[in-house]
Amino acid sequence: MAAPMEVVVCTDSAAPLWSCMVWELHSGANLLTYRGGQAGPRGLALLNGEYLLAAQQGKNYICAWELQRKDQLQQKIMCPGPVTCLTTAPNGLYVLAGIAESIYLWEVSTGNLLVILSRHYQDVSCLKFTGDGSHFVSAGKDCLVLAWSLCSVLQADPSRILAPRHVWSQHTLPITDLHCGFGGPMARVATASLDQTMKLWAISSGDLLLSVLFDMGITSVTMDLAEHYIFCGGSDGSIFQVDLCSRPGPREQSFQPEQNTGKVFKGHRNQVTCLSVSTDGSILLSGSHDESVRLWDVKSKQCVRTVPLKGPVTNAAITLAPPSMLNPEFRPSLPLPHFNKHLLGAEHGDEAQGGGLRLQLGLHLQGKEPSYLERLEQLQAALSGYLEKNMLGSQMLPVRVFELEEEVRSLRKINRDLFDFSTRIITRPSK
């Protein structure tokens, strides 16, 4: 069985003919191009291996393509404002988008907007799910990093303000990028900031594990799959490699390029906007505002390929090609629904909207039904009200009274028979 193909998915801010380009990692062969707009930074995501989502730069909608129908825009997902960052759950069930200082969470199967999280004070700049989808992390220009439990967010009382699991506030300038490692709730999160630091956090405990100070602002960050190294892109185009498996050191460190000459990648002429590592950890991908994507050999720190683009690179990542990307006959398992702009129940009450299911509880979970005596009392009350509201001289009144009295007698007999039957069953001697 052939090994899965690794591909590069990248976008820039000035491509006149295409929105996103996909090319094979090792050969550089162009495989696919998608047309329909310009994706903003941190605004590109694959959805369940079937759709490609791109948040349009400075616009209030997200473009969605089927992976194989690259020339036909499938849908425009309208949003309440310009989308600043975008991500999807690994299982394909949820979509997260940062809009201004709020986080919007959609359910993919129905298109319902489930929750709006408003705990940032300035624009949200980064969003990432953990590998198992149990948590997600948000970061913003307000220097805050928030770790959220997805289960807690979905089960929270809408009337209460949702609280993140952890609030990390040690950065002093806007956060530019973040990366979630593997491990689910035990994962580690790396964050990059213009305050010239990269920080490493533990989701399980909320502790700060490592802080590295550089001599420039850090604009991108990533880790290899084994989490042996952290790669940090600088504002001047340099890329720094931080070793996580060296001998134990202090929690707060300073990276000196002159003392770590073998751990610096040099070649870009402008700030590094995105970083990604191949599955075997041997190749580092970088995108920059110098309008180029570069591939680096991690061991030698040499650039092995440069791909020129038409504008500053906004997104670039290495990923395993989904089967649908290379199969022209593939079609999505489910069509992409219409995504709502308003919270579920906000516009049309609490009734389930189209695409939802109405669940009926079992008999043992349903509320107690009224007995025949209670129904009889209700009937007598209705009869009294009827007599009071209607004229006594009406010709139909005696007939209606007779009918109601007959119904009362019938209900009394039914209730008496049920009582006798229940008494016989309860008092029947056991064999």
From Swiss-Prot:
| Cellular component aspect of the GO annotation | dynein axonemal particle; nuclear pre-replicative complex; nucleolus; rixosome complex
One of the Pfam families matching this protein, by short name: WD40
- Keyword Cytoplasm attached: yes
Spans of WD repeats, please give.
36-75, 78-116, 119-158, 170-211, 213-257, 267-306
Zinc-finger as a keyword of this entry, yes or no, is: no
User: What PROSITE patterns would the database entry show?
Assistant: WD_REPEATS_1, WD_REPEATS_2, WD_REPEATS_REGION
Location relative to the cell: Nucleus, Nucleolus; Nucleus, Nucleoplasm; Cytoplasm; Dynein axonemal particle
Q: Which UniProt keywords apply?
A: Cytoplasm, Developmental protein, Nucleus, Repeat, WD repeat
Q: Which Gene3D superfamilies match?
A: YVTN repeat-like/Quinoprotein amine dehydrogenase
Source domain of life is Eukaryota
From the UniProt record, give one GO term of the biological process aspect: DNA-templated DNA replication
Please describe what this protein does.
Functions as a component of the Five Friends of Methylated CHTOP (5FMC) complex; the 5FMC complex is recruited to ZNF148 by methylated CHTOP, leading to desumoylation of ZNF148 and subsequent transactivation of ZNF148 target genes. Component of the PELP1 complex involved in the nucleolar steps of 28S rRNA maturation and the subsequent nucleoplasmic transit of the pre-60S ribosomal subunit. May play a role during development.
The record's similarity note reads:
Belongs to the WD repeat IPI3/WDR18 family.
Quaternary structure? Component of the 5FMC complex, at least composed of PELP1, LAS1L, TEX10, WDR18 and SENP3; the complex interacts with methylated CHTOP and ZNF148. Interacts with NOL9. Component of the PELP1 complex, composed of at least PELP1, TEX10 and WDR18. The complex interacts with pre-60S ribosome particles.
Which protein, by its recorded name, is this?
A: WD repeat-containing protein 18
Q: Which species?
A: Rattus norvegicus (Rat)
